[in-house]
């Protein structure tokens, strides 16, 4: 019987899951939209919704709780400075999960997870190192 089993294991150890969701939360806060598999997106939604609720509270204890969950102080800063005030009047439902077809290699169901009233200009901003070709001089 499957009583009391609230979450998916996703084929990972508990430490791996915790780290993965911390990284995915930071990426979602940073870019306000990410593409992942559907089960991961469904598991990520309540985690980020609770973080936004902490940001709406806005006190020091809430900030420390968010830092312990996300482990990225810069993204927690954005969470409390931008996303908390943006959703101040909304009573939950900050995240949307959209089905996005199937992945080519293994036919895994994919999904787009995004904030409801997201800032479109944040997508892809500072998403990693960029190659600069110096040989063209």
Curated annotation (Swiss-Prot):
Gene3D superfamilies linked: Ribosomal protein L17
GO biological process: translation
Keyword annotations from UniProtKB, A to Z: Ribonucleoprotein, Ribosomal protein
InterPro entries for the chain: Ribosomal_bL17, Ribosomal_bL17_CS, Ribosomal_bL17_sf
Taxonomy, superkingdom: Bacteria
PROSITE patterns: RIBOSOMAL_L17
GO terms, molecular function: structural constituent of ribosome
Cellular component terms (Gene Ontology): cytosolic large ribosomal subunit
NCBIfam families on file: L17 (TIGR00059)
Assembly behavior: Part of the 50S ribosomal subunit. Contacts protein L32.
Entry's family note: Belongs to the bacterial ribosomal protein bL17 family.
Name of the protein described by the UniProt record: Large ribosomal subunit protein bL17
Organism: Caulobacter vibrioides (strain NA1000 / CB15N)
Gene name as annotated: rplQ
């Amino acid at each position: 019987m499957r009583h009391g089993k609230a979450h998916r294991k996703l084929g990972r150890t508990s430490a791996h899951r915790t780290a993965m969701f911390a990284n995915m939360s930071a990426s979602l806060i940073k870019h306000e939209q990410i593409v992942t598999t559907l089960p991961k997106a469904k598991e990520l939604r309540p985690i980020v919704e609770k973080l936004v609720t902490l940001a709406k509270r806005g006190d020091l204890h809430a900030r420390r709780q968010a830092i312990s969950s996300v482990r990225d102080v810069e993204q927690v800063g954005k969470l409390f400075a931008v996303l908390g005030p943006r959703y101040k009047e909304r009573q939950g439902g900050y995240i949307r999960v959209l089905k996005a077809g199937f992945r080519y290699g293994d036919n895994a169901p994919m999904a787009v997870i995004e904030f409801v009233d997201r800032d479109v200009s944040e997508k892809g901003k500072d998403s990693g190192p960029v190659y600069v070709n110096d040989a063209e001089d």
